[in-house]
Amino acid sequence: MVINKWVFVYSEGHSLIKNGAWFVGFTDFSNVPGMLNDILYINRDGLQICYTTQEELDRVKEEGKVFFNETYQKKFKKAIDKCINNFIMLYDSYKTMNLRKLTNKELLCLFNKYIECECVLLAHYQVGGGRSFPLLEKYVKDGLVKQFSESEFNKNCTLLLSSHEIDILEKEEISLLDLGLNPSDEVLLEHANNYSFQFYNTYEIEIILNFLKERSKKLNQDYGSSKNYLEKKNKRKKLLLNEQKKQFNKIKNKKLKNLILFLREQGKLRLEYKEWKAGEEYKFLELFREISRRIGISLKEYLSTYKIEDTQLFLNKGKTIELKERDARKKIFVYFQKDGKKQFASGNKAEYLVEKILGKSKNKLTELKGISASSGKVTGKIRIILPIGIKEVQEDMKHFEEGDILVTTMTQPNILLIMKKASAIITDQGGMTSHAAVISRELGVPCIVGTYNATRILNNGDLVE
């Protein structure tokens, strides 16, 4: 196996447990489109990169044809809604528990239910990540090219795929404004639990409080109140809705209209789902804190070194992971599946496996292409930011200047402040319904998604148009 047979899928910061759940979510659900027979996860120092083969991506793209069927669209939405509802019911039950009083077997039962909810949700969430919808997106773009003139196409494509409803990011900002100028720490932490999607890969209370206080101050400076915020947003969304209706009614192709509505809805829903895709670890943080306490290690150590199976083994039989193995996993670990055979390795064994799979190729990547998710033309300096956690985001904010072009593997809600300063956004991952695509259309800035390698071709400080 050599490197040109394996292609980038996505990259972000993960705990080891979350990485394991993603691995299961990508491989173990044959009833969900987008499963990968061949997949490689490499996690170095907490930042992982996922690869698969081009053949797998081509197959998954073909599988995506099922979404041309309106009945299947509804079936899929019903399935993912069920995933969310199951997670909510588990969380409601979890909040009433005194974890200290649970036996190890009772804690194991709770942990297993959490993992089951997480894996099923991730299996469904990955469908809209830019791999299953390309044929739908192509059909929509081709249809709009025929419908509108060349000068109108980009503007109307962006317009028709934009949501005119208040989304979860805006609801969170409204809620934060409603807390007033100087909310207490207790009130802010309650807010954090209600909108935990922002705290992906972030576990330190002090960092979370500082992040919310900074944002609260900025929102109050910009808007003064949630009433002013809503008036401004609603005015814009009313104009958007009126123009949408005007352009949408020009389209006579019923199939095209259905797919526009489906992709628009998927973009909005993927934001809503992030509360449980990106915020679930924070919501269940006390569960992980209790497990790490019983093991006798810090929360950070636990999340970076314990697999799902390790936690199950500890809670069932009391077996722990040796320090040497934990240290190896902090440096590098690998999940790999080829032809249905699964492997996990860490440390030197992981390095050997990566070299065996990818080879030592140092071929320089030069080609950059992607999907235009929001039209426009700008010139600016490149600033590469990787989605790890709030601590890293706050450090990146210090170096990101107004008008810089944001380049990242994929965007998360916790970099929204940076996205608002960007003159354009470029991502390795994603499609027309991705977070970057949706937010760029709301912000009215150009966006290119699904480049696969922008973070590896472009460099900080590069001036691009």
Where are these regions (language model features)?
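Non-catalytic, soluble scaffold/interaction modules
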Residues: 1-465
